[in-house]
Structure formats: structure tokens, C-alpha cells
């Protein structure tokens, strides 16, 4: 009993000391649940601000991107942004390169968050991101992902066939295997491709295994779309953020009427065509389950409930109605995508309901303003 009291007192004293230093720290329980009869001491952690979120296509990654953009805007952090003025992609299909981004280091500024679409290249990213950067990404069931990709990217218009007919056409599937669609950006094994894998449909098993192991070593957390709320809880604790920081509405989600129901046969054929993605997803889905178990079932359930309550409260405050994206956004004319009509006009609600492209434009403008202020202050000295 006395030993437990000493541990608690030591934690409080440490927290008071670092608080006096003017640094924002927070209490956190350990990530892994403990079976010990003694109470676990509260950990003191500092919120992480240097983050790479590798955005994977059609994996709820736009929802995650909204979280990182909001956090960065709120804390005046610096984003890795494309040099190009006509796309919000950084390269892709070209992998990430320093030459593709706005170089803010020449203004003695440091990059904090990379969350825009790009293809993973760890060596190049390490050259621009701080050493303590946290790397995260998200994966989705490959059959569901490809259905979403085929619909969202209007591949039925390109191939003149719906998804079921396309999968049966070996000539068309071979063509997409040889040459990816939309200027090389989308195709089979999309998640593996986004994460830097260059293998063909039937790559040697060892090359896929080596690729998966390299991603396992490089990333601190791989989230799972089908377990999004639990993923957000693990993300919250990894980054030492608050629940409100990881609240988000679904961004770029399609209306149900635009989704194709997948038969068991179609699921199998899509899995065969996305073999590398199936192995990638299986590995990290199993790893995710272990992380959730280590976190503790009761603890996870309580935190998910807290997150859902917070999301519901923000939705009631911020959203008057759901509308199609073509009504809300100035950038995308999409009738199949859900967007939000704001109720509350606060900045917080504006950012929560903002479309991806509109948010990109806002972030780019704000960062340019920050650079201009910095240059002005230096020249006026």
C-alpha cells in the first residue's frame, strides 16, 4: 500500500515539475492492460506533433486526414505540401521525393505533419521529417476497397463494364495489371502500391513477405478501417492526444445506393486479383487484434463509447443536414459522396465538415501566410 502511494506521489511530483517548465504534458495509463492487483501508475506523456500519415486510397483515409489537418491547424504546425499548384497529391505514382514539396526549411521552418496522398518512400521521408516522427497508416479489406475504388474512380466508364463483368474479363484484368489506371495511380493491390510495393500481381511470396515485414518495422501503428473507432483510440494513446482530437465525421464516403453488393464469388475473385493486399491486410489485422487485446477489452469499450458520444455531440452542434458533395464543395462535383451542411459557423465546425480539397486549399493558404509573416518580421528588424 505504501509502495503504491509512493508511486502515485512520484508521478504527481514529476508532472508538477515539468508543468513548471511550461511544456504541455498529459496523464496516460499504459497502453497495455495489466493483470497486476496493484494499480498502474499514471504515465506522463507529451503530445506528439511530428507525424506521417500514409494516406491509402479508399480506406477512410480522408477521415483520418481531416483529423491531422485540424490538429495541425489548431496548433500552428507545418505541413508537407505539394509544390504543384494543380493537384493535392505529392507525386503518385512517383514515390515521395523532396523535390516534389514546398521547401519550408529555407525559412528555418521544420516539417511536422505529412498527410497528403503520396507513395511511401521511407528514406526520402526521413530526409524531411524530424527523427522523432510517428508513422501511421490504415488498411481495409481488399475486396471492399477495390469495389469502392472501381466506383469512386469511375472505372466502369473507362472499361465499359460494371465490376462483376470487369472481373470476368481476363483481357481487361490483365490490362489493369500491366498498366494502372488514372495516370498510374490506381489498380490492383492498391494499398501495397500506396505503401511503396512495385511487385506484379503474382509476385514471389518472399518478395511480398519482405515488403510486409518492412512496413511492420517502419510504422508505429497500422489502423484497420473495419475497426475505425478502436483504431482511433489506439491512435489517441500513441500520440498522447485527447478524445476531441480524434473526433471526425466520415469524409468522402459514398451513399449506400452507389455501393455494389459483393457476392461470395466476386469477393473471392477480387481477393485473387489483390493477392498482395490480402496478405498485407491479414498480417496487420492480426497484429491489430493483439494490440486491442493488450489494451484491454473493458477499457477499449469504455473509450470507444466516450469517442462515439463526443462525435454525436459534435454532429448535433455542427451539422444541419447531410448533402451530396456537389452541393457543398467548391472543388468536387460528386453526387455520390456524402457531405455536410453546417449548422454552427464556428471554425471548429467548419473544419470538421470541410471537404478534403477545400481543406487542402485552406491549409496551403494559411501556411503561405505564415511564411510571409516570418519573412516580413525578418526584413523589418
Across the structure, where does each feature detected by a protein language model lie?
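Short amphipathic alpha-helical segments embedded in low-complexity Lys/Glu-rich regions
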Residues: 70, 81-90, 152, 250-254, ...
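N-terminal signal-anchor transmembrane helix specifying type II single-pass membrane topology
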Residues: 1-35
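PAPS-dependent sulfotransferase catalytic core
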Residues: 117, 210, 244-354
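Signal-peptide-cleavage-adjacent N-terminal segments of secreted and extracellular proteins
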Residues: 31-100, 109-111
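Long, hydrophobic alpha-helical transmembrane bundles and adjoining juxtamembrane helices/loops
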Residues: 3, 10, 14, 18, ...
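Amphipathic alpha-helical interaction motifs in eukaryotic regulatory proteins
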Residues: 60, 65, 69, 147, ...
Amino acid at each position: 500500500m505504501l509502495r503504491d502511494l509512493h508511486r502515485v506521489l512520484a508521478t504527481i511530483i514529476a508532472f508538477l515539475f515539468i508543468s513548471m517548465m511550461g511544456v504541455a504534458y498529459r496523464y496516460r495509463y499504459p497502453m497495455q492492460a495489466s493483470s497486476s492487483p496493484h494499480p498502474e501508475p499514471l504515465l506522463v506523456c507529451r503530445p506528439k506533433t511530428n507525424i506521417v500519415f500514409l494516406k491509402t486510397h479508399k480506406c477512410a483515409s480522408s477521415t483520418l486526414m481531416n483529423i491531422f489537418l485540424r490538429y495541425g491547424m489548431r496548433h500552428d504546425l507545418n505541413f508537407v505540401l505539394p509544390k504543384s499548384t494543380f493537384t493535392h497529391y505529392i507525386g503518385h505514382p512517383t514515390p515521395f521525393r523532396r523535390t516534389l514539396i514546398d521547401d519550408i526549411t529555407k525559412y528555418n521552418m521544420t516539417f511536422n505533419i505529412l498527410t497528403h496522398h503520396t507513395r511511401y518512400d521511407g528514406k526520402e521521408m526521413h530526409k524531411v521529417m524530424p527523427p522523432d516522427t510517428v508513422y501511421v497508416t490504415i488498411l481495409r479489406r481488399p475486396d471492399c476497397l477495390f469495389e469502392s475504388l472501381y466506383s469512386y474512380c469511375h472505372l466502369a466508364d473507362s472499361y465499359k463494364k460494371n465490376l462483376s463483368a470487369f472481373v470476368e474479363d481476363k483481357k481487361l484484368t490483365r490490362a489493369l495489371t500491366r498498366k494502372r489506371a488514372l495516370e498510374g495511380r490506381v489498380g490492383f493491390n492498391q494499398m501495397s502500391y500506396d505503401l511503396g510495393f512495385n511487385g506484379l500481381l503474382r509476385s514471389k511470396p518472399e518478395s511480398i513477405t519482405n515488403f510486409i515485414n518492412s512496413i511492420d518495422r517502419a510504422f508505429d501503428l497500422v489502423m484497420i478501417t473495419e475497426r475505425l473507432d478502436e483504431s482511433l483510440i489506439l491512435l489517441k494513446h500513441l500520440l498522447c492526444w485527447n478524445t476531441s482530437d480524434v473526433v471526425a465525421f466520415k469524409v468522402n464516403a459514398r451513399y449506400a445506393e452507389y455501393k455494389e453488393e459483393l457476392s461470395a464469388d466476386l469477393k473471392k475473385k477480387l481477393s485473387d486479383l489483390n493477392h498482395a493486399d490480402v496478405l498485407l491486410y491479414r498480417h496487420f489485422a492480426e497484429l491489430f487484434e493483439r494490440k486491442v487485446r493488450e489494451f484491454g477489452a473493458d477499457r477499449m469499450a469504455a473509450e470507444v463509447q466516450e469517442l462515439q458520444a463526443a462525435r454525436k455531440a459534435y454532429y448535433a452542434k455542427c451539422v444541419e443536414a447531410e448533402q451530396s458533395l456537389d452541393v457543398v464543395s467548391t472543388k468536387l462535383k460528386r453526387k455520390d459522396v456524402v457531405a455536410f451542411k453546417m449548422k454552427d459557423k464556428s471554425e471548429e465546425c467548419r473544419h470538421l465538415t470541410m471537404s478534403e480539397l477545400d481543406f487542402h486549399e485552406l491549409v496551403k493558404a494559411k501556411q503561405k501566410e505564415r511564411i510571409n509573416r516570418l519573412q516580413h518580421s525578418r526584413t523589418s528588424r
